Protein backbone atom coordinates (compact mmCIF):
# COMPACT_ATOMS: atom_id res chain seq x y z
CA UNK A 1 0.00 0.00 0.00
CA UNK A 2 1.29 3.45 -0.89
CA UNK A 3 0.47 6.54 1.18
CA UNK A 4 0.00 9.71 -0.87
CA UNK A 5 -0.23 13.16 0.73
CA UNK A 6 -0.34 15.56 -2.24
CA UNK A 7 -3.07 16.27 -4.75
CA UNK A 8 -0.56 16.40 -7.60
CA UNK A 9 0.86 12.92 -6.93
CA UNK A 10 -2.55 11.32 -6.34
CA UNK A 11 -3.94 12.80 -9.55
CA UNK A 12 -0.87 11.71 -11.51
CA UNK A 13 -1.24 8.12 -10.24
CA UNK A 14 -4.97 7.86 -10.95
CA UNK A 15 -4.66 9.44 -14.42
CA UNK A 16 -2.08 6.80 -15.37
CA UNK A 17 -4.19 3.98 -13.90
CA UNK A 18 -7.30 5.07 -15.81
CA UNK A 19 -5.28 5.56 -19.02
CA UNK A 20 -4.07 1.96 -18.71
CA UNK A 21 -7.69 0.76 -18.47
CA UNK A 22 -7.73 -0.03 -14.73
CA UNK A 23 -10.95 0.35 -12.73
CA UNK A 24 -10.68 2.37 -9.50
CA UNK A 25 -12.89 1.85 -6.46
CA UNK A 26 -12.86 4.89 -4.15
CA UNK A 27 -13.87 5.06 -0.48
CA UNK A 28 -13.86 8.63 0.91
CA UNK A 29 -13.74 8.79 4.74
CA UNK A 30 -12.93 11.12 7.61
CA UNK A 31 -10.82 8.39 9.21
CA UNK A 32 -11.06 6.61 12.58
CA UNK A 33 -12.03 3.59 10.53
CA UNK A 34 -14.28 0.85 11.90
CA UNK A 35 -15.96 -2.29 10.56
CA UNK A 36 -18.46 -0.19 8.59
CA UNK A 37 -15.62 1.39 6.63
CA UNK A 38 -13.89 -2.00 6.28
CA UNK A 39 -17.07 -3.35 4.64
CA UNK A 40 -16.93 -0.51 2.07
CA UNK A 41 -13.28 -1.29 1.37
CA UNK A 42 -13.93 -5.01 0.90
CA UNK A 43 -16.78 -4.26 -1.50
CA UNK A 44 -14.51 -1.90 -3.45
CA UNK A 45 -11.81 -4.61 -3.50
CA UNK A 46 -14.26 -7.17 -4.93
CA UNK A 47 -15.47 -4.90 -7.72
CA UNK A 48 -12.35 -3.01 -8.88
CA UNK A 49 -8.75 -3.57 -9.89
CA UNK A 50 -7.46 -0.69 -7.75
CA UNK A 51 -8.76 0.59 -4.39
CA UNK A 52 -8.16 4.17 -3.23
CA UNK A 53 -9.07 5.24 0.32
CA UNK A 54 -9.06 8.89 1.37
CA UNK A 55 -8.76 9.97 5.00
CA UNK A 56 -9.56 13.67 5.36
CA UNK A 57 -11.48 15.44 8.11
CA UNK A 58 -13.17 18.05 5.95
CA UNK A 59 -13.61 21.36 7.80
CA UNK A 60 -16.16 22.63 5.26
CA UNK A 61 -18.81 20.18 6.46
CA UNK A 62 -18.60 21.12 10.15
CA UNK A 63 -20.69 24.00 11.52
CA UNK A 64 -19.36 26.63 13.97
CA UNK A 65 -20.59 24.71 17.05
CA UNK A 66 -19.82 21.20 15.81
CA UNK A 67 -17.18 18.72 16.84
CA UNK A 68 -14.39 19.31 14.27
CA UNK A 69 -11.65 19.47 16.92
CA UNK A 70 -13.18 16.59 18.88
CA UNK A 71 -13.60 14.32 15.87
CA UNK A 72 -11.54 11.20 16.66
CA UNK A 73 -8.33 10.73 14.66
CA UNK A 74 -5.92 7.78 14.60
CA UNK A 75 -3.96 7.47 11.36
CA UNK A 76 -1.93 4.44 12.54
CA UNK A 77 -5.14 2.52 13.14
CA UNK A 78 -6.48 3.73 9.78
CA UNK A 79 -3.34 2.49 8.00
CA UNK A 80 -3.77 -0.95 9.57
CA UNK A 81 -7.45 -1.18 8.57
CA UNK A 82 -6.51 -0.06 5.04
CA UNK A 83 -3.76 -2.68 4.71
CA UNK A 84 -5.96 -5.46 6.13
CA UNK A 85 -8.69 -4.69 3.58
CA UNK A 86 -6.64 -4.51 0.41
CA UNK A 87 -6.21 -0.76 -0.14
CA UNK A 88 -3.68 0.10 -2.86
CA UNK A 89 -3.44 3.85 -2.24
CA UNK A 90 -4.21 5.76 0.96
CA UNK A 91 -4.73 9.44 0.14
CA UNK A 92 -4.04 11.42 3.32
CA UNK A 93 -3.84 15.15 2.52
CA UNK A 94 -3.59 18.02 5.00
CA UNK A 95 -6.22 20.77 5.14
CA UNK A 96 -3.64 23.12 3.56
CA UNK A 97 -3.13 20.66 0.70
CA UNK A 98 -6.86 20.36 -0.02
CA UNK A 99 -7.66 24.04 0.55
CA UNK A 100 -4.47 26.03 -0.17
CA UNK A 101 -6.49 29.24 -0.47
CA UNK A 102 -10.03 30.30 0.29
CA UNK A 103 -12.42 28.62 -2.15
CA UNK A 104 -13.66 30.89 -4.93
CA UNK A 105 -16.27 28.24 -5.80
CA UNK A 106 -18.32 25.84 -3.70
CA UNK A 107 -21.09 23.42 -4.65
CA UNK A 108 -24.50 24.49 -3.37
CA UNK A 109 -27.03 21.69 -2.87
CA UNK A 110 -30.59 22.93 -3.35
CA UNK A 111 -32.71 19.78 -2.84
CA UNK A 112 -32.81 16.89 -0.33
CA UNK A 113 -31.04 18.96 2.34
CA UNK A 114 -33.83 20.74 4.24
CA UNK A 115 -34.90 17.68 6.26
CA UNK A 116 -33.29 15.21 8.71
CA UNK A 117 -29.69 16.18 9.64
CA UNK A 118 -29.46 18.75 6.85
CA UNK A 119 -32.23 20.83 8.42
CA UNK A 120 -30.14 21.43 11.55
CA UNK A 121 -26.80 21.67 9.75
CA UNK A 122 -27.07 24.47 7.18
CA UNK A 123 -24.09 24.37 4.83
CA UNK A 124 -23.14 20.80 5.81
CA UNK A 125 -24.04 19.22 2.48
CA UNK A 126 -22.46 22.09 0.54
CA UNK A 127 -19.25 21.13 2.36
CA UNK A 128 -19.75 17.44 1.55
CA UNK A 129 -20.50 18.10 -2.14
CA UNK A 130 -17.58 20.52 -2.48
CA UNK A 131 -15.01 18.12 -1.02
CA UNK A 132 -16.41 15.24 -3.10
CA UNK A 133 -16.18 17.29 -6.30
CA UNK A 134 -12.51 17.79 -5.44
CA UNK A 135 -11.90 14.17 -4.40
CA UNK A 136 -13.62 12.75 -7.50
CA UNK A 137 -11.43 14.98 -9.69
CA UNK A 138 -8.31 13.91 -7.78
CA UNK A 139 -8.97 10.15 -7.60
CA UNK A 140 -10.92 9.68 -10.89
CA UNK A 141 -12.92 6.71 -9.56
CA UNK A 142 -14.91 4.23 -11.60
CA UNK A 143 -17.04 3.53 -8.51
CA UNK A 144 -17.39 5.31 -5.15
CA UNK A 145 -18.71 3.58 -2.02
CA UNK A 146 -20.88 5.13 0.70
CA UNK A 147 -22.56 3.63 3.74
CA UNK A 148 -26.34 3.86 4.02
CA UNK A 149 -25.95 4.87 7.67
CA UNK A 150 -26.00 8.41 6.32
CA UNK A 151 -28.77 7.78 3.81
CA UNK A 152 -29.44 11.49 3.34
CA UNK A 153 -25.83 11.95 2.28
CA UNK A 154 -26.21 9.09 -0.23
CA UNK A 155 -29.37 10.72 -1.65
CA UNK A 156 -27.59 14.09 -1.96
CA UNK A 157 -24.51 12.53 -3.61
CA UNK A 158 -26.59 10.54 -6.11
CA UNK A 159 -28.39 13.76 -7.08
CA UNK A 160 -25.17 15.76 -7.32
CA UNK A 161 -23.42 13.14 -9.49
CA UNK A 162 -26.44 12.97 -11.83
CA UNK A 163 -26.82 16.77 -12.03
CA UNK A 164 -23.16 17.34 -12.96
CA UNK A 165 -22.83 14.25 -15.20
CA UNK A 166 -19.88 13.03 -13.13
CA UNK A 167 -18.71 9.72 -14.64
CA UNK A 168 -18.70 7.70 -11.42
CA UNK A 169 -21.02 4.92 -10.25
CA UNK A 170 -22.27 5.54 -6.69
CA UNK A 171 -22.51 2.27 -4.74
CA UNK A 172 -24.61 2.47 -1.54
CA UNK A 173 -23.66 -0.19 1.05
CA UNK A 174 -25.92 -1.47 3.84
CA UNK A 175 -25.42 -0.31 7.44
CA UNK A 176 -23.00 -2.44 9.45
CA UNK A 177 -24.16 -3.14 12.99
CA UNK A 178 -22.80 -4.38 16.29
CA UNK A 179 -24.15 -7.75 17.46
CA UNK A 180 -26.83 -5.95 19.50
CA UNK A 181 -28.00 -3.92 16.49
CA UNK A 182 -26.32 -0.57 17.19
CA UNK A 183 -25.09 0.98 13.93
CA UNK A 184 -21.29 1.11 13.91
CA UNK A 185 -20.01 4.68 14.14
CA UNK A 186 -16.78 6.49 14.98
CA UNK A 187 -18.83 8.50 17.50
CA UNK A 188 -19.99 5.48 19.55
CA UNK A 189 -16.83 5.90 21.67
CA UNK A 190 -18.49 8.94 23.29
CA UNK A 191 -21.34 6.89 24.81
CA UNK A 192 -21.19 6.27 28.56
CA UNK A 193 -21.49 2.65 29.75
CA UNK A 194 -25.17 3.17 30.59
CA UNK A 195 -25.90 4.92 27.28
CA UNK A 196 -24.15 2.11 25.38
CA UNK A 197 -26.60 -0.35 26.95
CA UNK A 198 -29.56 1.83 25.91
CA UNK A 199 -28.33 2.66 22.39
CA UNK A 200 -29.46 -0.63 20.71
CA UNK A 201 -33.04 0.49 21.35
CA UNK A 202 -32.64 2.93 18.44
CA UNK A 203 -32.50 0.07 15.95
CA UNK A 204 -35.16 -1.88 17.86
CA UNK A 205 -37.53 1.07 17.46
CA UNK A 206 -36.97 0.96 13.68
CA UNK A 207 -37.51 -2.81 13.56
CA UNK A 208 -40.76 -2.42 15.51
CA UNK A 209 -41.91 0.26 13.05
CA UNK A 210 -41.01 -1.97 10.10
CA UNK A 211 -43.12 -4.78 11.57
CA UNK A 212 -46.08 -2.41 11.93
CA UNK A 213 -45.72 -1.25 8.32
CA UNK A 214 -45.46 -4.85 7.10
CA UNK A 215 -48.59 -5.65 9.12
CA UNK A 216 -50.45 -3.00 7.11
CA UNK A 217 -50.02 0.38 8.87
CA UNK A 218 -49.76 3.11 6.22
CA UNK A 219 -50.10 6.30 8.26
CA UNK A 220 -46.66 7.97 8.49
CA UNK A 221 -47.52 10.01 11.59
CA UNK A 222 -48.63 6.94 13.55
CA UNK A 223 -45.35 5.20 12.72
CA UNK A 224 -43.08 8.14 13.64
CA UNK A 225 -44.99 8.72 16.91
CA UNK A 226 -44.54 5.04 17.82
CA UNK A 227 -40.79 5.30 17.21
CA UNK A 228 -40.42 8.48 19.32
CA UNK A 229 -42.41 7.02 22.19
CA UNK A 230 -40.41 3.78 22.14
CA UNK A 231 -37.05 5.61 22.26
CA UNK A 232 -38.25 7.97 25.01
CA UNK A 233 -39.45 4.97 27.05
CA UNK A 234 -36.32 2.82 26.76
CA UNK A 235 -33.50 5.39 26.65
CA UNK A 236 -32.52 8.64 28.39
CA UNK A 237 -31.70 10.12 24.99
CA UNK A 238 -33.57 13.08 23.49
CA UNK A 239 -35.20 12.40 20.13
CA UNK A 240 -33.95 15.02 17.68
CA UNK A 241 -36.14 13.63 14.92
CA UNK A 242 -37.98 10.49 13.89
CA UNK A 243 -39.15 11.14 10.35
CA UNK A 244 -40.44 9.23 7.36
CA UNK A 245 -39.88 10.35 3.75
CA UNK A 246 -39.97 9.08 0.19
CA UNK A 247 -36.46 7.92 -0.79
CA UNK A 248 -34.25 9.17 -2.39
CA UNK A 249 -36.29 12.34 -3.10
CA UNK A 250 -36.81 12.98 0.66
CA UNK A 251 -40.28 14.34 -0.05
CA UNK A 252 -42.79 14.34 2.82
CA UNK A 253 -45.31 11.48 2.72
CA UNK A 254 -48.56 11.14 4.68
CA UNK A 255 -49.39 7.68 3.39
CA UNK A 256 -46.62 5.11 3.24
CA UNK A 257 -46.04 3.67 -0.24
CA UNK A 258 -43.16 3.04 -2.63
CA UNK A 259 -39.57 3.32 -1.42
CA UNK A 260 -39.36 5.09 1.91
CA UNK A 261 -36.83 5.90 4.61
CA UNK A 262 -37.54 5.99 8.33
CA UNK A 263 -34.70 7.91 9.98
CA UNK A 264 -33.91 8.87 13.56
CA UNK A 265 -31.43 11.05 15.42
CA UNK A 266 -31.08 10.81 19.19
CA UNK A 267 -28.95 13.03 21.45
CA UNK A 268 -27.20 11.45 24.40
CA UNK A 269 -25.06 13.48 26.82
CA UNK A 270 -21.90 13.69 24.69
CA UNK A 271 -22.96 12.36 21.31
CA UNK A 272 -25.78 12.40 18.79
CA UNK A 273 -26.49 9.09 17.03
CA UNK A 274 -28.33 8.53 13.75
CA UNK A 275 -29.87 5.41 12.27
CA UNK A 276 -32.36 4.51 9.57
CA UNK A 277 -34.05 1.79 7.59
CA UNK A 278 -35.21 1.96 3.98
CA UNK A 279 -37.94 -0.28 2.65
CA UNK A 280 -40.21 -0.62 -0.35
CA UNK A 281 -43.91 -0.73 0.44
CA UNK A 282 -46.33 -2.02 -2.18
Curated annotation (Swiss-Prot):
ATP binds at residues 30-37, 147-150, 176, 184-187. Pathway: Cofactor biosynthesis; (R)-pantothenate biosynthesis; (R)-pantothenate from (R)-pantoate and beta-alanine: step 1/1. One of its GO terms (biological process) is pantothenate biosynthetic process. One of its GO terms (molecular function) is pantoate-beta-alanine ligase activity. Disulfide bonds: none annotated. It catalyses: (R)-pantoate + beta-alanine + ATP = (R)-pantothenate + AMP + diphosphate + H(+). It comes from the Bacteria. InterPro entries: Cyt_trans-like (IPR004821), Pantoate_ligase (IPR003721), Pantoate_ligase_C (IPR042176), Rossmann-like_a/b/a_fold (IPR014729). The keyword Iron-sulfur does not apply. The active site is at 37 (proton donor). Its EC number is 6.3.2.1. The keyword Ion transport does not apply. Keywords: ATP-binding, Cytoplasm, Ligase, Nucleotide-binding, Pantothenate biosynthesis. (R)-pantoate binds at residues 61, 153. It is found in: Cytoplasm. Belongs to the pantothenate synthetase family. Catalyzes the condensation of pantoate with beta-alanine in an ATP-dependent reaction via a pantoyl-adenylate intermediate. The reaction proceeds by a bi uni uni bi ping pong mechanism. This is Pantothenate synthetase. It comes from Bacillus anthracis.
